Design a protein with these regions (language model features):
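Juxtamembrane/disordered regions of integral membrane proteins
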Residues: 2-214
């Protein structure tokens, strides 16, 4: 047997091994691919984006809270004034009493604030991925601005303005003396802009089988 014969057989063997690997992948695709293929999302994956928005909302809430804490400190206000106002929906006016210094309650207020942000994150991320996926950063920021302003108006003046007095006998959250309207709006805008900036973190990239690779 000549060297050329051996080289030819080795080349043929390499071809057969490659063919065997391809056939194994096809068998795997036939055995498991039907289920995977039916599950794989080819359109809009609402469950994924809602879950991703839940996580991204936590990040955005932390950023907006830090923005408010730093801003309040620079302005010579109580760093946790936002949380105190937030806690009036439950504790009433005593949450704003300077003598109120319950560390656990304030910590729980921060937790509830972040939890609210996680829920809002679902709304923001679903809308952004559904309607602003091809808009670029500037487009997403514009969408986030509109959503944030709409959420602020709806929550503060469409819901809280009448619900808090009804339940707790006061309207501290919409009282400009306690929380100026522009501070509340700016907090919502920072949340929305953060959602627009970290939007790529929550994009879905479907898994592709080896046989589907180009």
């Amino acid at each position: 047997m000549t060297r050329s014969d051996v080289a030819g057989k080795k080349a043929r063997l390499a071809e057969l091994q490659a063919e065997a690997a391809r056939l194994e992948a096809e068998v795997d695709a036939e055995e498991f691919g039907a289920a995977v293929g039916s599950w794989a999302q080819r359109g809009y994956y609402l469950t994924y984006y809602a879950t991703a928005g839940f996580f991204l909302g936590m990040v955005a809430a932390l950023v907006s809270l830090m923005f408010n804490i730093i801003g309040a400190t620079v302005a010579g206000k109580d760093p946790l004034q936002l949380i105190r106002v937030y806690l009036t929906f439950g504790l009433g006016g005593r949450a704003l009493d300077p003598a109120f210094d319950d560390g656990l309650a304030l910590a729980m207020g921060c937790v509830l604030y972040i939890a609210t942000g996680m829920l809002l994150g679902i709304v923001f991320h679903v809308i952004l991925t559904r309607y602003a996926s091809g808009a670029g950063l500037a487009g997403r920021l514009a969408w986030a601005t509109a959503i944030a302003a709409a959420v602020w108006l709806m929550n503060f003046y469409g819901l809280i303005a009448w619900l808090q007095p009804l339940l707790f006998g006061g309207s501290w959250i919409v009282d400009n003396a306690e929380l100026p309207w522009w501070v509340a709006l700016a907090t919502h805008l920072v949340f929305g802009w953060t959602m627009a900036l970290i939007y790529p973190w929550g994009l879905f990239h479907p898994y592709r089988l080896q046989t589907e690779q180009p």
